[in-house]
Amino acid sequence: MEKKIRIGICGYGNLGHGVELAVNRAADMELVGVFSRRDLPGTDSGVPAINLKHVLDYKDKIDVMILCGGSATDLVDQGPELAQNFVTVDSFDTHPRIPEHFANMDAVTKANNTAAIISVGWDPGLFSLLRVLGDSVLPEGKSYTFWGKGVSQGHSDAIRRIPGVKNGKQYTIPKQEYLDAVRSGKGTDAPGNEMHLRECFVVPE
């Protein structure tokens, strides 16, 4: 391509590293830099690591800023702030707060003539679309959602932000009795939080 989409990454945790890999494999994109509140020693791909306080110096050098911070505290502040000057994409996944996040981002982008896509990814995102498709072809059916067994990045991030916690991981595990009930056709009226076990492993400071 003659002109590639110029990408910036804000946040350099697990998600930021993953986005860096994906952008570098996309023929129509080029990574301009990685922005962080920390002073990073460098990046895996060799692109500049830039302190977030200098982000406005890149306003005309980046077409899309991909926000890779945590939903618990980062994106609610960084999203509206960065959307004043950049087109942004985020993976905000605190489901009950998505309408609030949408309203905040919508107001900022309209006021500043920018654009933002929120809650992009697997869940919410593609997983949400799959549920809609399922409900559309089986209108008399009932959808159940199970997560895991696996690490929840969002919940793990929330654990690590608790004072006194040095490190932590949270595993989301479907409860077998609910899996069996759904698979057998009996179903259940239990809410999603009852159908899962959230197992936390914490290292204190």
PLM feature spans:
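Rossmann-fold NAD(P)-binding glycine/threonine-rich loop
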Residues: 92-116
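Active-site regions of enzymes building and remodeling cell-envelope glycoconjugates
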Residues: 44-55, 86
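Hydrophobic/small residue at the entry helix of a nucleotide-binding pocket
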Residues: 15
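Extreme N-terminal starter segment of soluble prokaryotic enzymes
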Residues: 2-7
